[in-house]
A protein has these predicted regions:
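Metal-associated gating/positioning segment near the N- to mid-region
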Residues: 60-117
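Hydrophobic faces of well-ordered beta-strands that scaffold small-molecule active sites
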Residues: 68-74, 101-103, 134-140, 176-180, ...
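Charged helix-capping and loop-helix junction motifs
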Residues: 84-87, 116-121, 160-161, 238-244
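Active-site core of metal-dependent hydrolases
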Residues: 169-246
Length: 246
């Protein structure tokens, strides 16, 4: 079951009954759950959950109720990109059980497109289904400077503060994760400036031909995630596979 985000601010008690509850340690086959506002107040076997008088009761008809899925890296739905249509994308993902999403912007967007997209996401996240949008996953601006997919990378060449400063000004409070290529010359200056603005910023390594030494060098800035780490170019040997964006 997916929550009704248009009613999320209501503070009267709601309940889901006649449902199979997926919990951390198993399934409650005849379960019930109550919540008030954004807090779950009871969960368990139906006969052990007290439904208050006047509660808004939803009969699940035997369907499953599960914790919402969290997606920290997705560019859009089957029809739309988050940078262009964040609300339509949010509608798609909440229908599939995702209740927290970080829209991902790729380095094929220029500065103006990233800023405009961030503003759309920020506005969409304030109400309705858009409230599942909990920040940005910045797959850029500084990804792999060599290897595959170069024609789509708009942030190549030298990393300059005057180039990225307007982006940080606009999105640093919204971005949760910044994907970077540790092998890019000048990447440490960019990472240091991000952390100065947001000490809680998380970095992801990806789309990179970095060596182990490159990766160790940037660890101190808060690298906690890896993504697409195997697509930086052709593999050696006969079984080379194909080159792509991930």
């Amino acid at each position: 079951m997916c929550p009704d985000y248009d009613q999320q601010e209501d503070h009267f008690v709601k309940a889901i009954v006649n449902t199979k509850l997926i919990l951390e340690d198993g399934i409650v086959w005849n379960g019930a759950i109550t919540w008030e506002g954004d807090r779950i107040t009871q969960v368990g076997e139906a006969d052990a959950v007290v439904i208050p008088d006047g509660a808004d009761v939803i009969d699940a008809g035997g369907l499953y109720t599960a914790p919402g899925l969290i997606d920290i890296h997705t560019h859009g739905s089957t029809e739309h990109l988050f940078c262009e249509e964040p609300t339509k994308c949010a509608e798609h993902f909440v229908r599939h059980g995702e209740t927290t999403v970080l829209p991902a912007f790729y380095c094929n967007l220029n500065l103006e497109q990233m800023v405009a997209g961030a503003r759309r996401v920020r506005e969409a996240s304030k109400s309705g289904v858009g409230r599942i949008l909990d920040g940005l996953y910045m797959e850029g601006p500084y990804m792999n400077g060599q290897g595959s997919n170069q024609k789509y990378i708009l942030w190549g060449g030298e990393i300059r503060r005057e180039e990225y400063a307007p982006l940080l000004e606009e999105v640093c409070d919204l971005a949760r994760v910044w994907a970077i290529d540790p092998a890019r010359e000048g990447i440490e200056g960019f990472m240091a400036d991000v952390r100065e603005r947001d000490p809680q910023a998380i970095f992801a390594m990806g789309h990179s031909h970095a060596t182990a030494a490159d990766c160790r060098r940037v660890k101190k800035y808060g690298v906690k995630v890896q993504t697409h780490h195997g697509d930086s170019g052709k593999a050696p040997g006969k079984a080379q596979g194909t080159i792509g964006a991930g």
